[in-house]
A protein has these predicted regions:
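Surface-exposed patches in mature extracellular/periplasmic domains of secreted proteins
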Residues: 101-108, 205-208, 275-282
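Amphipathic alpha-helical surface "interface" segments used
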Residues: 114, 212-219, 285-288
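Acidic/His-rich structured neighborhood in mature extracellular/periplasmic domains
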Residues: 76-200
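Post-HExxH zinc-binding segment in Zn-dependent metallohydrolases
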Residues: 1-30, 181-222, 299
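Pan-zinc metallopeptidase signature
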Residues: 224-301
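A metal-dependent hydrolase signature that marks the N-terminal structural subdomain at the beginning
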Residues: 1-120
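Short coil/turn segments at secondary-structure junctions
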Residues: 70-77, 151, 244-248
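An acidic intrinsically disordered interaction segment
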Residues: 153-163, 212-235
């Protein structure tokens, strides 16, 4: 397995050209003509409105923060990624899951649309998430302000952590039954759990603030009772409140990632005789939900 790190900003396009574009139609045309830069969204061409929304995010963020491109350039210039270190961890996971494709980690600019995401067999990383928000005069009451303050302190650690997390999504078995939102809790939970086993840079691999994580630990029983009700009622909309970065559960965000981790951790204790490697392999090959629903129910008793 080969891991490549590609910087689209520096190698493929001068983003400042976007400033010259005035109309939505022209902007859409520009993005389509530069599909190498927008490779992560090539599939979205089939869905013009989605592609247009992404294009507008690019444009609007540049208008709102005029010096953002210069700040991104500084961030990219200062980041040093140890490709061997991260490649070794991804190779370990690929061998356990029998995943034999090469992986591109592509750095791009998403206009605060997506932070890090997977499309096909690649991982796409939006580098604007590592800007110090004070450097672009972002107001501290904006939702993403606190994330940027946290992520800009040590971008390399965040990249290592989240690339492992996203690769787990790529190389693991797809859960077959998606009729209930517990499938998503399992997917995020195993990604967080495996990341925590392989990389100890972040507490539990959750990328949560200290205060939010402290609150989750203190209110774990309440959270799981609420989650159990959501799962039992198959309330997908309410479930995604737990995943949201917008502080939807008692003023705390990303609670679902904490709960997914705890769900997987609790289940792992029932197979404690297995080695760490065997546990990770079992998680990567999980494609059913029933055993985790039983675990969730027992956590609420």
């Amino acid at each position: 397995m080969e891991v490549r790190i590609i910087n689209l900003e520096k190698k493929l396009i001068n983003l400042k050209n976007i400033k010259k574009i005035l109309s939505d139609k022209e902007l859409l045309k520009f993005c389509r003509e530069n599909e190498k830069f927008l490779n992560s969204y090539v599939r979205a061409k089939e869905f013009e409105e989605d592609f247009k929304d992404f294009s507008l995010n690019l444009y609007n963020s540049i208008i709102k923060y005029p010096n953002i491109l210069d700040e991104i350039d500084k961030v990219v210039s200062n980041i040093v990624i140890n490709k061997k270190e991260i490649g070794d961890k991804l190779l370990f996971l690929s061998e356990l899951s029998n995943y034999n494709k090469n992986l591109d980690i592509i750095m791009f600019y998403g206009g605060f649309n997506d932070g890090i995401c997977t499309y096909g067999d690649n991982i796409y990383y939006a580098m604007e998430w590592f800007i110090n928000p004070d450097n672009i005069n972002m107001k501290n009451d904006e939702i993403i302000y606190r994330y940027l303050k946290q992520y800009s302190i040590n971008p390399e650690d965040i990249i290592y952590n989240t690339v492992i997390h996203e690769f787990v999504h790529i190389c693991s078995c797809e859960i077959e039954d998606k009729s209930n939102p517990i499938w998503h809790l399992i997917e995020e939970g195993r990604a967080v759990y495996i990341t925590n086993q392989l990389d100890k840079r972040d507490d539990l691999g959750l990328l949560m603030s200290e205060n939010d994580l402290k609150w989750c630990k203190e209110n774990e029983k309440y959270l799981f009772n609420e989650m159990f009700n959501v799962i039992s009622e198959n309330d997908e909309n309410k479930y995604f409140d737990f995943i949201s970065p917008r502080r939807n559960i008692c003023g705390v965000s990303r609670t679902g990632y904490f709960m997914g981790y705890k769900l997987i951790e609790t289940y792992m204790k029932t197979i404690d005789k297995l080695s760490q490697k065997e546990k990770i392999k079992k998680l990567l090959c999980t494609n059913e939900t029933e055993v985790y629903f039983k675990t969730l129910r027992n956590m609420c008793l």
